């Protein structure tokens, strides 16, 4: 029965996002966001015995409900004064609507809820929060992009995403701050090219799925649990290490491709100041990925009797190997195809 209800909620979750991105009015977009929210809450609260999960789902609901109420208020004002037109909005209404969408997506300076909610979720639900749940708000943001307003959010997202992950001992919080940093890059890509941010999001989602599935299989939630995999196959440890480097955007891995495209675009437009800041802050995120990798490779602990056996089954192993191959060698394959063509 629980599996059937979860499947229904999962279908309505996808339906809500599709309603939002295909809507031609703000009210229809709001309805899609609400369908998405009310479908995701039961999926988040999959383990009722875990109080941290219940707390996270409550925090998520309160934050999203607050954002939705402000968004509905702004939409009513828009319908009353401007006949629900996307283009005929004054700055006050526009900033109010876009601020609520930034709050829903977890971008700085409205990011306060995101790491705390991530901390209480399972890896699969956290993956949905980092990827699928951002699609609808980002699509709505791309319809109305205010340069000066979003420049502040871009810089703050990259800054907080980089510095916030430095002192973390929780892998889920580290991934949350990493997501905030990547969200800054997506907004930066959106500033110049609508297709560019979609490409960035697609590759980021692929890399996140690859690394999160590995964390989920080994039940890794904190840095000290990484010592458990010191007795693992060295190839598995190497795959985690390379995936982290790819997520950090280090060449020649696939994660470098979207950043490369954004850098190229910004260089052509002469926006060197924001480009320099973005690259410098990304180096900090690469540092805490390397710090996580150091725990995997350099530190060795004796196996304790209380350590749980991992459930890294063959089926999931094959899926992970495919995703890892794409993540690690994707950029090389794209370059080879480009050279052939």
UniProtKB/Swiss-Prot annotation:
Alphabetical keyword list: Electron transport, Membrane, Mitochondrion, Mitochondrion inner membrane, NAD, Respiratory chain, Translocase, Transmembrane, Transmembrane helix, Transport, Ubiquinone
Membrane topology category: Multi-pass membrane protein
Enzyme class name: translocase
Localization, UniProt: Mitochondrion inner membrane
This protein's record includes keyword Membrane: yes
Enzyme Commission number(s): 7.1.1.2
Tree of life domain: Eukaryota
Primary location recorded for the protein, binned into one broad class: mitochondrion
GO BP terms, alphabetized: mitochondrial electron transport, NADH to ubiquinone
GO molecular function, one term: NADH dehydrogenase (ubiquinone) activity
A Pfam family of this chain: NADH_dehy_S2_C
Reactions listed under catalytic activity: a ubiquinone + NADH + 5 H(+)(in) = a ubiquinol + NAD(+) + 4 H(+)(out)
Transmembrane segments annotated in the record for this chain: 8-28, 61-81, 95-115, 145-165, 174-191, 195-215, 238-258, 270-290, 321-341
One annotated Gene Ontology cellular component of this protein: mitochondrial inner membrane
Role: Core subunit of the mitochondrial membrane respiratory chain NADH dehydrogenase (Complex I) that is believed to belong to the minimal assembly required for catalysis. Complex I functions in the transfer of electrons from NADH to the respiratory chain. The immediate electron acceptor for the enzyme is believed to be ubiquinone.
Stated family: Belongs to the complex I subunit 2 family.
Name of the protein in question: NADH-ubiquinone oxidoreductase chain 2
Gene: ND2
């Amino acid at each position: 029965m629980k599996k059937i209800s979860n499947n229904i909620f999962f279908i309505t979750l996808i339906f809500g996002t599709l309603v939002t991105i295909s809507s031609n009015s703000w009210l229809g977009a709001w309805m899609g966001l609400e369908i998405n929210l009310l479908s995701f809450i039961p999926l988040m609260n999959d383990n009722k015995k875990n109080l941290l999960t219940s707390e996270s789902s409550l925090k998520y609901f309160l934050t999203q409900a607050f954002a939705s109420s402000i968004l509905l208020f702004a939409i009513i004002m828009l319908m009353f004064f401007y006949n629900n037109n996307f283009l005929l909005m004054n700055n006050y209404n526009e900033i109010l609507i876009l601020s609520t969408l930034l709050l829903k997506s977890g971008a700085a300076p409205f990011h306060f809820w995101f790491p705390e909610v991530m901390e209480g979720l399972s890896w699969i639900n956290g993956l949905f929060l980092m990827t699928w749940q951002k699609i609808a708000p980002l699509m709505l943001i791309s319809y109305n992009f205010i340069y000066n307003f979003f420049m502040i959010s871009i810089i703050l997202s990259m800054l907080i995403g980089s510095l916030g992950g430095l002192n973390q001992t929780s892998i889920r919080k580290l991934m949350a701050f990493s997501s905030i940093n990547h969200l800054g890059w997506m907004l930066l890509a959106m500033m110049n090219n609508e297709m560019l941010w979609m490409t960035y999001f697609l590759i980021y989602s692929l890399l996140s799925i690859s690394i999160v599935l590995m964390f989920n299989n080994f039940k890794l939630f904190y840095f000290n649990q990484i010592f458990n995999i010191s007795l693992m196959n060295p190839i598995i440890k190497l795959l985690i290490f390379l995936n982290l480097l790819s997520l950090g955007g280090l060449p020649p891995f696939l994660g470098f491709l979207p950043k490369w495209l954004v850098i190229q675009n910004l260089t052509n437009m002469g926006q060197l100041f924001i480009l320099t800041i973005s690259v410098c802050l990304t180096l900090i995120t690469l540092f805490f990925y390397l710090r996580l990798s150091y725990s995997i490779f350099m530190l060795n602990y004796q196996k304790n009797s209380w350590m749980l056996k991992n459930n890294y089954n063959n089926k999931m192993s094959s899926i992970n190997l495919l995703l890892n191959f794409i993540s690690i060698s994707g950029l090389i394959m794209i370059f080879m195809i480009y050279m052939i063509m």
